[in-house]
Regions:
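N-terminal binding-site loop/beta-alpha segment at the start of enzyme catalytic domains
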Residues: 43-126, 185
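Beta/alpha (TIM)-barrel catalytic core signal, keyed to glycine-rich beta->alpha loops juxtaposed to Asp/Glu
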Residues: 52, 170-362
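Active-site mouth loops of central-metabolism enzymes
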Residues: 71-84, 132-144, 173, 205-206
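Active-site groove signature of glycoside hydrolases
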Residues: 155-173
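Acidic (Asp/Glu)-rich catalytic clusters
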Residues: 57-59, 115-123, 154-158, 188-190, ...
Length: 363
């Protein structure tokens, strides 16, 4: 069954899921609640304390936790640690936890799995974000390549529209090309109803100081941006978030947790390296073990929990993306995103240490 826009009113409608035919509940019911557990025979409705927000000027109601289907894991498919069926189950688990924002991309190779996972679900209760890698600047018709990529994504995802279609990993030297040669095609796709909103994602590893996004946010072209932001590199707080909030551009937060923030020794190594390079003043740590300080002062059970809480409650961040192939990690990560902010003294300490750092990614 191909997922299409809902055309009915707010009353009941008949939908068929495999061999199970159910009477769907009025649309109003879904807002603020979880989705029907369609993959378990529709025998119950799970309600979780997910929080929702409005994604900038798009007006989309999105969960504050989003499932990232790329990253180092790619739902466990990158290193074949998980089967396709396990990846499908993971996506459905995320939805069962209240996540309605799913982010994938052409280059991740996970669009087919996302399509299979959401097949038969109410399409208008999901927000699907995918991306197109930039064609070569020497391409004779790069706009046509963008349109071709969109058609492929629609087919793989089993839908007739994408909520947010991004230009993927745009670097500073490629921004003018993206704006002048590719944006017209994106606008045409939006006018045709094949995409609802236009986004751009930065290449955080080659551009950790956000040069491309600083340039792009000077113009009113983008509905949504994807930004690298974490407690080791909070530079977007100064350079991007004031602009995104002023212009009401939706913000997706990637790189909340990477290798350096997944375990205490990784963070200790980063601090030692920064001290050695003089990036943070010697003595600024007061001889304290930073992971231990964070744990004691915040009550976080793990360093990733603290890192997710840091991002979730940053003014300007709408959706924090989390990616994994492990069901237990997914549950823990979503729970972390839903926990309270870090205490002010912890945030102040982190600002003192990392507030001027704009070249780390956390990898």
């Amino acid at each position: 069954m191909r997922n299409r826009r809902s055309t009915g009113d707010s009353g009941a409608a008949q939908l068929t899921f495999d061999r199970v035919t159910v009477q769907t509940i009025r649309k109003d019911f879904y807002y603020g609640l979880n989705f029907l557990n369609v993959w378990n025979g529709l025998n119950h409705i799970a309600v979780n304390p997910m929080e929702y927000t409005t994604l900038g000027k798009t007006g989309l109601k999105v969960s504050v936790a989003g499932l990232g289907c790329g990253g180092p894991s790619r739902l466990g498919l990158r290193d074949s640690s998980q089967s396709e069926n396990s990846a499908i189950a993971l996506i459905r688990q995320a939805i069962d936890l209240g996540v309605n924002f799913l982010d994938t991309a052409q280059t991740y190779g996970t669009e087919p799995v996302v399509g299979k996972a959401i097949a038969g679900m109410p399409r208008d209760r999901l927000v699907i974000s995918t991306k197109k890698t930039l064609p070569s600047p020497g391409h004779s018709n790069p706009g046509a390549e963008v349109k071709k990529g969109l058609e492929q994504s629609l087919k793989l995802l089993g839908t007739d529209y994408i909520d947010i279609y991004h230009l993927h990993g745009v670097e500073p030297q490629d921004y003018d090309f993206a704006r002048e040669r590719l944006m017209p095609a994106m606008v045409q796709l939006r006018e045709q109803g094949k995409i609802r909103f236009i986004g751009v994602t930065e290449g955080f590893v080659p551009d950790p100081s956000h040069q491309m996004l600083q340039q792009s946010l000077k113009e009113d072209l983008w509905d949504v941006v994807m930004i690298g932001f974490n407690l080791l590199n909070p530079s977007a707080r100064r350079t991007l978030f004031p602009l995104t909030m002023e212009k009401r551009v939706g913000v997706l937060n990637m790189f909340a947790v990477r290798r350096a923030l997944s375990q205490a020794d990784g963070l200790r190594g980063v601090v030692a390296d920064l001290l050695e390079k003089g990036a943070i003043p010697r003595g600024s740590t007061n001889g304290e073990d930073l992971p231990d300080f964070i744990w004691r002062q915040s009550g976080a059970a793990t360093l990733p929990e603290a890192a997710y809480r840091f991002c979730r409650h940053e003014p300007g961040v709408d959706v924090v993306l989390t990616g994994t192939g492990n069901p237990e990690h997914l549950k823990s990560n979503v729970e972390s995103i839903l926990k309270p902010p870090l205490p002010k003294n912890v945030l102040q300490r982190l600002e003192e240490l990392f507030g001027d750092v704009d070249y780390l990614t956390g990898n």
